[in-house]
């Protein structure tokens, strides 16, 4: 009997990607985050679609329409909070996924890695524009502050900002276009994710040792399908605990006040998942310098393959690099904390030290540690 799974033009693609895919036998739970990100994206598209059915992208009614969703639409409150907290879960999975890539040297798959960095940028842009849509105080002022950063670009900056705003301030035109982009970008992200997967399957997955696993492969189904289902259940459990018990834990109370251009909130800050970059931005007392540091804090990921000086791919057998990796993780947590604090002593100096440490670790200390480890092993 001819196996339809292996011969049908469409089924064949699914089969080669999720069923008969040869996978390393030793990949750990850190390899679960790819599938979890896919689940997050599908969840965000579905909840977002239902929210868009009731939302109005107009400055006069946007805030009221979100209130209407929560009060009057059947299960509107759960859809709204699943979407808001789903974004937080999305970024937790993203950071874990990128961290895994850094730790195990997955960035040596150049095409996969570079598309991943583009995906990270696209997701951050989508999340930023989504945060503007409820049109609360933090939505409005967040949009004003972040878009204003582009005015630091020499010569064209001011014109560029006014072009993005569609006027001389964040107003109706800005909200409408942000809604349009926020709606379309997740589909672009989905397409890019498929390309990401396509390039990954050209090389096959990396594994914790960083050594070729060609000699020991197992089929993706049933082994990793069941493992991914466990991961998905845990993801949904954590998400629903957030949604049902403390839906506003990660939000800002200021966003329950309708946007008012005449009243600036005392502390303007983005959502928690941007705080590390926001802290780096604020730690440089120069507009253009801060913006460059902000962009480079993410763009530095593209340089990772060039900064890899070790003769080994993974950090599994490199204790000095492991130590520096976890210092980097702690540094990012410190930056996240500082990004949410007011600009005053001692937070300013802590933020500046943490920012210097961030770039120093990635650009100097980790490559140096790799070279030391090579010499210790007489390689």
Curated annotation (Swiss-Prot):
Which Pfam family name is an example for this entry? Cytochrome_B
What does the record say about how the cofactor binds? Answer: Binds 2 heme b groups non-covalently.
GO cellular component annotations of the record: mitochondrial inner membrane; respiratory chain complex III
Q: Where in the cell is it found?
A: Mitochondrion inner membrane
Q: Which GO terms describe its molecular function?
A: metal ion binding; ubiquinol-cytochrome-c reductase activity
Q: Please tell me where heme b b566 binds in this chain.
A: 97, 196
Q: Which residues bind heme b b562?
A: 83, 182
Q: What is its main location?
A: mitochondrion
Gene Ontology biological-process entries: mitochondrial electron transport, ubiquinol to cytochrome c
Which UniProt key words apply to this protein? Electron transport, Heme, Iron, Membrane, Metal-binding, Mitochondrion, Mitochondrion inner membrane, Respiratory chain, Transmembrane, Transmembrane helix, Transport, Ubiquinone
Q: Which residues cross the membrane?
A: 33-53, 77-98, 113-133, 178-198, 226-246, 288-308, 320-340, 347-367
* Topology term for the membrane: Multi-pass membrane protein
* Required co-factors: heme b
Record: residues binding a ubiquinone: 201
Its biological purpose: Component of the ubiquinol-cytochrome c reductase complex (complex III or cytochrome b-c1 complex) that is part of the mitochondrial respiratory chain. The b-c1 complex mediates electron transfer from ubiquinol to cytochrome c. Contributes to the generation of a proton gradient across the mitochondrial membrane that is then used for ATP synthesis.
Subunit info?
A: The cytochrome bc1 complex contains 11 subunits: 3 respiratory subunits (MT-CYB, CYC1 and UQCRFS1), 2 core proteins (UQCRC1 and UQCRC2) and 6 low-molecular weight proteins (UQCRH/QCR6, UQCRB/QCR7, UQCRQ/QCR8, UQCR10/QCR9, UQCR11/QCR10 and a cleavage product of UQCRFS1). This cytochrome bc1 complex then forms a dimer.
Record's family? Belongs to the cytochrome b family.
Also noted in the record is: Heme 1 (or BL or b562) is low-potential and absorbs at about 562 nm, and heme 2 (or BH or b566) is high-potential and absorbs at about 566 nm.
Q: What is the protein name stated in its UniProt record? A: Cytochrome b
Supply the source organism's classification. Answer: Eukaryota, Metazoa, Chordata, Craniata, Vertebrata
Its gene is: MT-CYB
